Amino acid sequence: MTSPAPTIGVLALQGDVREHVAALEAGGARAVTVRRVAELRGVDGLVLPGGESTTIDRLLRVFELREVLRERIAEGLPVYGSCAGMILLADRVLDGAPDQQTLGGLDVTVRRNAFGRQVDSWEEDLPLPEITRGGPPVEGIFIRAPWVEEAGEEVRVLARLGSGPAAGRIVAVRQGDLLATSFHPEITGDDRVHRYFVDVVRERVAG
């Protein structure tokens, strides 16, 4: 018997909200947008899209979502952060704005805008065996993206860059039910990263 579709929210303050919603629905979830505390309380998991991490941090406070979201993460809410979402989930940030705060939860140190300006963005196919399960690699599109400088012992490294000046840098991690990627899978039409996250949420809901 197939388990019911989990309800996964997409934080709708900035970023590729529609693309994330479409990828989640293709992956078998019921996707909803989240802008208010009441909407956040009704989800089984959450996606933090890309955008500008300092702006999202400020908007989380404006919409009074920040503390509630920190509490839900501490309680075990599955969360997937892409690009700026990775920064928001990180416990430590290098090259952040002076007053920038994160939600935390991932025992990683990330470097903000590690790939440089938007014109210095990077593309690379990533094997991601835990997600692709023997299939073709995932297209990684990095736009002013962070990378992980250091990862704690409980953090699973899912992908590193294999070429270019940043070869060896960590660009996808998982710790418990928290998932983060430096790249933007939502804009490639490949829903496998989102499908993987939907499975994470489904397993959490099933207990």
Swiss-Prot record:
Listed under GO cellular component are: cytosol; glutaminase complex
Q: What's a Gene Ontology MF term here?
A: pyridoxal 5'-phosphate synthase (glutamine hydrolysing) activity
> Which key words tag this protein in UniProt?
Glutamine amidotransferase, Hydrolase, Lyase, Pyridoxal phosphate
In this record, what's one Pfam family? SNO
Query: What processes in GO biological process is this protein linked to?
Result: glutamine catabolic process; pyridoxal phosphate biosynthetic process; pyridoxine metabolic process
Q: Does the record bear Secreted in its keywords? A: no
> Is Ribonucleoprotein a UniProt keyword of this protein?
no
**What EC number(s) does the entry state?**
4.3.3.6, 3.5.1.2
Reaction(s) catalysed (UniProt annotation):
aldehydo-D-ribose 5-phosphate + D-glyceraldehyde 3-phosphate + L-glutamine = pyridoxal 5'-phosphate + L-glutamate + phosphate + 3 H2O + H(+); L-glutamine + H2O = L-glutamate + NH4(+)
Cysteine disulfide partners in this protein: none
This protein's pathway reads: Cofactor biosynthesis; pyridoxal 5'-phosphate biosynthesis
Enumerate the active-site residues: 83 (nucleophile), 184 (charge relay system), 186 (charge relay system)
Q: Where does L-glutamine bind?
A: 51-53, 112, 143-144
Its subunit composition reads: In the presence of PdxS, forms a dodecamer of heterodimers. Only shows activity in the heterodimer.
NCBIfam families listed in its UniProt record: PLP_synth_Pdx2 (TIGR03800)
Q: Which family does it belong to?
A: Belongs to the glutaminase PdxT/SNO family.
Record's function text: Catalyzes the hydrolysis of glutamine to glutamate and ammonia as part of the biosynthesis of pyridoxal 5'-phosphate. The resulting ammonia molecule is channeled to the active site of PdxS.
Q: What is this protein called?
A: Pyridoxal 5'-phosphate synthase subunit PdxT
Originating organism: Kineococcus radiotolerans (strain ATCC BAA-149 / DSM 14245 / SRS30216)
Organism classification, top ranks? Bacteria, Bacillati, Actinomycetota, Actinomycetes, Kineosporiales
What is the gene called?
A: pdxT
